[in-house]
UniProtKB/Swiss-Prot annotation:
It comes from Homo sapiens (Human). This is Protein fantom. CDD domains: C2. Negatively regulates signaling through the G-protein coupled thromboxane A2 receptor (TBXA2R). May be involved in mechanisms like programmed cell death, craniofacial development, patterning of the limbs, and formation of the left-right axis. Involved in the organization of apical junctions; the function is proposed to implicate a NPHP1-4-8 module. Does not seem to be strictly required for ciliogenesis. Involved in establishment of planar cell polarity such as in cochlear sensory epithelium and is proposed to implicate stabilization of disheveled proteins. The gene is RPGRIP1L. Belongs to the RPGRIP1 family. Keywords: Cell junction, Cell projection, Ciliopathy, Cilium, Coiled coil, Cytoplasm, Cytoskeleton, Disease variant, Joubert syndrome, Meckel syndrome, Repeat, Tight junction. Residues 577-713, 773-897 form the C2 domain.
Length: 1315
């Protein structure tokens, strides 16, 4: 029933008749022979070896496939990396080397790719495990199948298929191992099958039932085995994990042990070196200490002697200073008294001469009228006088010709002189002098005309009256008796005498008339000459204005270029422009080297040292006896720490150790590279100890000439000296940025720093400059300048008592200020100093036009002191505002001013000096006290020439004294001014409202005593006033002994509207009648002492008819009481006399954006918003924005802009703006009834193609301000979100001063507004 069980039974040769039965015959002989041969060859090899070979081939095939797949994955990754890098490189080249794309992390992408690879591998492993499980199940099923003698059961019906016993029956026998000798043996008799068929079927059915039961039991066993296999697998995995963890722990422990050993070795080397150095230093220090002790003893003795000598010298110095001060005061008072004495003496001499002339004329008139006895003598004298008159007439004619020639010469000389000296100013002076002479001549002509109207009768009556008065005085009564007795006798004779005297007087009057006619002609000639000079002056003025416009345009172009070049220089010197490069990929580098881009700042470089390998000589092997020594190397480069290579075993250790150093390419580094070498030491390690066995010197000077990697070798020298040729070291080094490019960048940076810090002067140079500057300023008044240009020199000497925001650190201060329309100027940074000495000197060339004049009179120069070490941006440690009004009057500003921080607390002092190089000449549209002083200068030229030049403003810092105010507590200033001219014609009080507003950061201002020179004003002389009134007013100008003190609003305090109204009442009480004659000054922060007309031409045209007002030159110092909120009134000033005039304040709206703060909102959490600036818009006017954008503040913090803008709304030039204010007061429906402040997000520098975005909006209603009757002074207004539903996002601190302008508009349109 069952076949043989031998495994090799199928391999025995049998007769195969099955193939021939099917008719294949010879067609299958070749294949069968081949199979037979292969089976015979396989039968010679054992089954176990065949299985072993098969399994090996199968495993090798699987490994090769896995390796091929890994290589394909690597190739794909490298291809994607290469494509990505090529695309990035092309994009960077198109953009121009811009910064790399944000949000891209190469390491993250690499990690993601590795994780994806692991996922793929795990999925493959999972599939293989599933296949194995399926195959295992199939094997279990096949093993449980029981073999039967029947391959199959024949079908009981005819299915049309060939029966299996025809072809398969004979083929099964060889497979089962049954041998047949003949084909007939295989046929079974049919009767036997039918006989046993039923019994076999029943047995088969029983066996099938048994087998089904066995199958069920086997399935249960299989499930149990599978469950057991899973349990074993989990246990196996757990054990594998435990083994791996133990292996990892052992490896980590081994690595930590090795690292600790290396660290210990390195520390031992360092400690050994430090010990040697410390011992040497200690011995040297001991010797120095002994020497210093001896020197200290001698220094103490000399110090005590010097201190005693210094105390004596200090006492002497104090005494000498006191004496000097007293002598200076006496000299000052003596100078003034001498001037007054000289002036009075000159006037006395003039009056005495006039008195003598009048006396002589009176005597002559008396003798000619009443001396009858000397008639004959008079006739002789008359003839002689006629002869003399004829001679004088001829002489007069010759003198007139000479005079005309002299005048012509004088005119030519004047023209030449005008070309050399300041032509415009000299022409003005000549015009004023000629004008004054013409006025005097007109007055004399009037007097002579009045004398010509006298009749002969009136003359005789006047002579008789004079004679009678004289006789009464003399008491000669006998003459009257004689006249009474002889009156009848000599009546005819007296009549004849009277007729003769009348004829003589008529002749004299005729001569006088002729002389007056001649003088009138001369005056006409003078008047024509004056008109010609005036036309010439106007032409010159037009030419000058055209030149000034051209110069201003050229200066604007030059300023723009300078600003651009300064920005480029600052970018080169301080910019953060980064140098990008890719590391070189050498042929011997591995393919998987991580590709990165290193970013270097300007001036930085990356120096690399690579220690490749060390080759020991055979002598080392013989001497040491160790075939595989354990070695490592150490070296130290420049000022960096010691570097250690890995520990390697062998005679030819390959360390492959690279160290990178971030260096600054400067003179020290270049000198170090060129001249110095570094020492590389080779150490041999013995477990936890080591020994230095060899050393060598590494040189790097070739890097200055070559670029890229420079490969070198160095010979090792044994430390013991017994082995001279110890071995060689192979190393290479390189600079990432090539040396030529690094040196070029360093030179550019050094050159830019030199340009930027070129204004930094040493203290000795500044001292010599300060000594020479006053001479230059004095000479500049007569020297000519290039057109209308002038230079303002600003010097920042020092700061004192500065404090850092961190109390335990010293600040690194520097000062920043902005003058006029020039760029910001900053000083050098003084590191770690509370009292820095800057000595920073800067000059600004400016055209003397109306814009500059308005700026000087209405603005202050703000000095900000910043701390360079402060990490928080835009927070200054001190600020002060210096008024510039004194510069508009050609005066120097020099003093020590008190600084205040952003919290309005005192923060130290600063010493600044501002002065002109040449004399400041105000433009033609503005008149100053100096121009008016030129009017009087022609009357007394000699006195003016004897005066010393104007002294600069001297300052004296006093103790600060707090003063309560609306929102500030500044310290008062004590201000006094010394007169530049000998007279002062008028006095004024400070204008109550027309002043510049002080910046809110200024709280404490130092109390300064200023001696300032003031210029007299034009005396107002009425046409009806007599000569006596003029003399009387002139005498009044000399009577005062005290100077008037004038106050600058920018130096004292801010002014509220209440104080303005109070001072208006005071000034109206003092002098209400001259209010209409006053015109407002262009200054917003100073007092022009006296009435000033709007321009020079109007003042000169009105000069003959001006009235003369008196003034007293007073010298007094007055202070404002701390309890007042406004400048001192007339009752608080002790030295002021005369009239005080009231000027109308300038009509303007002042807007100041101070600071911005944000709260917790979406704006603070939005990372795309980085920098913010503020925009301000008033109705349809162009928007004004802060000049800089500041970083977004954190929640609750403030950023300070400190930006101010002024909108002028005066009647003359800004009527449209006043109409807008009128509409606001009428509360009409307007698109913007208020000031609109918009907080705007500025895109970052690397994304300039993006547009600005409105973040927040704030409003200030001007109509509400007018109803409340007050300005907004440092008020915090709410900022609402412009993008969302209008929720609050922060606060904006602003100052809006518009109440005065609104009140002015309301007064002008009161009827319309009330209607």
């Amino acid at each position: 029933m069952s076949g043989p069980t031998d495994e090799t039974a199928g391999d025995l040769p049998v007769k195969d008749t099955g193939l021939n039965l099917f008719g294949m015959g010879g067609l299958q002989e070749t294949s069968t022979t081949r199979t037979m041969k292969s089976r015979q060859a396989v039968s010679r090899v054992s089954r176990e070896e065949l299985e072993d070979r098969f399994l090996r081939l199968h495993d090798e095939n699987i490994l090769l496939k896995q390796h091929a797949r890994k290589q394909e994955d690597k190739i794909k990754r490298m291809a994607t990396k290469l494509i990505r890098l090529v695309n990035d490189k092309k994009r960077y080249e198109r953009v121009g080397g811009g910064p790399k794309r944000l949000g891209r992390d190469v390491e993250m992408e690499e990690m993601i790719e590795q994780l994806q690879e692991k996922v793929h591998e795990l999925e493959k492993q999972n599939e293989t495990l599933k296949n194995r499980l399926i195959s295992a199940k199939q094997q279990l099923q096949t093993q449980g199948y029981r073999q039967t003698p029947y391959n199959n059961v024949q079908s009981r019906i005819n299915t049309g298929r060939r029966k299996a016993n025809e072809n398969a029956g004979l083929q099964e026998c060889p497979r089962k191992g049954i041998k047949f000798q003949d084909a007939d043996v295989a046929e079974t008799p049919h009767p036997m099958f039918t006989k046993y068929g039923n019994s076999l079927l029943e047995e088969a059915r029983g066996e099938i039932r048994n087998l089904e039961n066995v199958i069920q039991s086997q399935r249960g066993q299989i499930e149990e085995l599978e469950h057991l296999a899973e349990i074993l697998k989990t246990q196996l995995r757990r054990k594998e994990n435990e083994i791996e963890l133990s292996l990892l722990q052992l490896r980590e422990q081994q690595a930590t042990d090795q690292r600790s050993n290396i660290r210990d070795n390195v520390e031992m080397i360092k400690l050994h070196k430090q010990l040697v150095e410390k011992s040497n230093a200690l011995s040297a220090m001991e010797g120095k200490f002994i020497q210093l002790q001896e020197k200290q003893r001698t220094l103490r003795i000399s110090h005590d002697a010097l201190m005693a000598n210094g105390d004596e010298l200090n006492m002497q110095l104090k005494e000498q200073r006191l004496k000097c001060c007293s002598l200076e005061k006496q000299l000052h008072s003596m100078k003034f008294s001498e001037r007054r004495i000289e002036e009075l003496q000159d006037r006395i001499n003039d009056l005495e001469k006039e008195r003598e002339l009048l006396k002589e004329n009176y005597d002559k008139l008396y003798d000619s009228a009443f001396s009858a006895a000397h008639e004959e003598q008079w006739k002789l004298k008359e003839q002689q006088l006629k002869v003399q008159i004829a001679q004088l007439e001829t002489a007069l004619k010759s003198d007139l010709t000479d005079k005309t020639e002299i005048l012509d010469r004088l005119k030519t000389e004047r023209d030449q002189n005008e070309k050399l000296v300041q032509e415009n100013r000299e022409l003005q002076l000549q015009y004023l002098e000629q004008k004054q002479q013409l006025d005097e001549l007109k007055k004399r002509i009037k007097l002579y005309n009045q004398e010509n109207d006298i009749n002969a009768d009136e003359l005789s009556e006047a002579l008789l009256l004079i004679k009678a008065q004289k006789e009464q005085k003399n008491g000669d009564l006998s003459f009257l008796v004689k006249v009474d007795s002889e009156i009848n006798k000599d009546l005819e004779r007296s009549m004849r005498e009277l007729q003769a005297t009348h004829a003589e007087t008529v002749q004299e009057l005729e001569k006088t008339r002729n002389m007056l006619i001649m003088q009138h002609k001369i005056n006409k000639d003078y008047q024509m000459e004056v008109e010609a000079v005036t036309r010439k002056m106007e032409n010159l003025q037009q030419d000058y204005e055209l030149k000034v416009e051209q110069y201003v345009h050229l200066l604007d172009i030059r300023a723009a270029r300078i600003h651009k070049l300064e920005a480029q220089l600052k970018d080169i010197a301080y910019g953060t422009k980064q140098y990008k490069f890719k590391p070189e990929i050498m042929p011997d580098d591995s393919v998987d080297e991580f590709d990165e881009t290193i970013h270097l700042e300007r001036g930085e470089n990356l120096f690399e040292i690579h220690i490749n390998k060390v080759t020991f000589s055979s002598e080392v092997l013989q001497a040491s006896g160790d075939k595989e020594p354990v070695t490592f190397c150490t070296y130290a480069f420049y000022d960096f720490e010691l570097q250690t290579t890995p520990v390697v075993r062998g005679l030819h250790p390959e360390y492959n150790f690279t160290s990178q150093y971030l260096v600054h390419v400067n003179d020290l580094f270049l000198q170090y590279i060129q001249k110095n070498t570094i020492t590389l030491e080779v150490h041999q390690a013995y477990s936890t100890e080591y020994e230095t066995i060899a050393a060598c010197q590494l040189k790097f000077h070739e890097i200055l000439e070559k670029s890229g990697r420079i490969f070198c070798t160095a010979s090792l020298i044994g430390t013991k000296g017994d082995i001279p040729n110890f071995g060689t070291v192979e190393y290479w080094f390189r600079l990432r940025v090539p040396m030529d490019q690094a040196i070029r960048l360093y030179r550019e940076r050094a050159k830019a720093l030199g340009y930027i810090t070129s204004n930094f002067k040493g203290p000795e140079h500044m001292q010599s400059l300060s000594q020479q500057a006053p001479k230059t300023a004095q000479l500049s008044s007569t020297d000519s300048t290039d057109g209308n240009l002038n230079e303002l020199h600003i010097t920042i000497r020092c700061c004192n008592h500065l404090q850092s925001r961190a109390s335990h650190l010293q600040p690194h201060p520097y000062v920043v200020y902005k003058f006029f329309d020039f760029a910001d100027h900053d000083t050098a940074i003084i590191p770690s100093s509370n009292d820095p000495q800057f000595d920073d000197h800067m000059y600004f060339p400016v055209p003397m036009n109306m814009d500059l004049d308005r700026y000087l009179k209405s603005e202050s120069l703000s000095f900000y002191v910043f701390d360079d070490s402060d990490t928080q941006e835009n927070i200054y440690i001190g600020k002060v505002n210096v008024p510039l009004i004194s510069l508009a009057h050609d005066r120097c500003i020099s003093g020590i001013f008190e600084l205040t921080d952003h919290q309005k607390h005192p923060a130290g002092t600063i010493h600044v000096i501002l002065k002109w190089k040449f004399a400041y000449l105000p433009p033609s549209g503005s008149i100053t006290t100096e121009d008016l002083g030129n009017f009087i200068r022609s009357e007394e030229p000699e006195v003016v020439q004897r005066l010393p030049p104007a002294s600069s403003v001297s300052t004296l810092v006093l103790a600060p004294r707090p003063k309560p105010r609306q929102r500030l507590t500044p310290v008062d200033k004590k201000v006094s001014f010394v007169d530049i001219m000998p007279h002062q014609s008028d006095e004024t009080s400070p204008p109550p409202e027309d002043r510049k507003e002080i910046s809110p950061e200024v709280e404490h201002i130092p109390e300064i005593e200023i001696n300032m020179l003031t210029v007299p004003h034009v005396p107002k002389v009425s046409q009806e006033g007599s000569v006596d009134e003029v003399k009387e007013n002139t005498e009044k100008m000399q009577q005062g002994k005290d100077d008037v003190s004038l106050l600058s609003e920018g130096q004292l305090a801010e002014q509220s509207l209440a104080s303005s109204e109070d001072e208006t009442e005071i000034t109206e009480d003092l002098e209400p009648e001259v209010e209409e004659d006053m015109s407002a000054s262009d200054s917003d922060d100073c007092i022009i002492p006296g009435p000033i007309s709007k321009n020079i031409k109007q003042s000169l045209a009105l000069s003959p008819g001006l009235g003369c007002s008196s003034a007293i030159s007073a010298h007094c110092n007055f202070r404002l009481p701390g309890s007042s909120d406004f400048p001192a009134s007339a009752s608080q000033v002790d030295g002021i006399t005369g009239a005080c005039h009231h000027t109308q304040p300038s009509e303007k709206i002042r807007i100041e954006i101070i600071a911005l703060s944000l709260n917790d909102s979406q704006v603070t959490m939005d990372d795309t918003i980085q920098r913010l600036f503020v925009e301000c818009r008033f109705y349809s006017l162009p928007a004004e924005e802060t000049p800089v954008s500041l970083p977004k503040p954190k929640s609750g913090q403030w950023v300070y802009y400190n930006y101010s803008n002024v909108i002028y709304v005066d009647k003359e030039n800004n009527k449209a703006k006043r109409d807008i204010l009128k509409a606001i007061l009428q509360k009409q429906e307007m698109p913007n009834r208020s000031l609109r402040f918009t907080v705007v997000s500025d895109p970052p520098e690397d994304e300039q193609d993006l547009e600005c975005e409105d973040i927040g909006v704030a409003h200030v209603d001007l109509a509400d301000m007018f109803q409340e009757g007050r300005d907004l002074i440092e008020q915090n207004i709410d900022v609402f979100d412009a993008r969302a539903d209008g929720e609050g996002i922060g606060k904006l601190r602003v100052t809006v001063e518009a109440l005065h302008a609104l009140q002015s508009v309301y007064k002008q349109y009161r009827d319309d507004l009330e209607a």
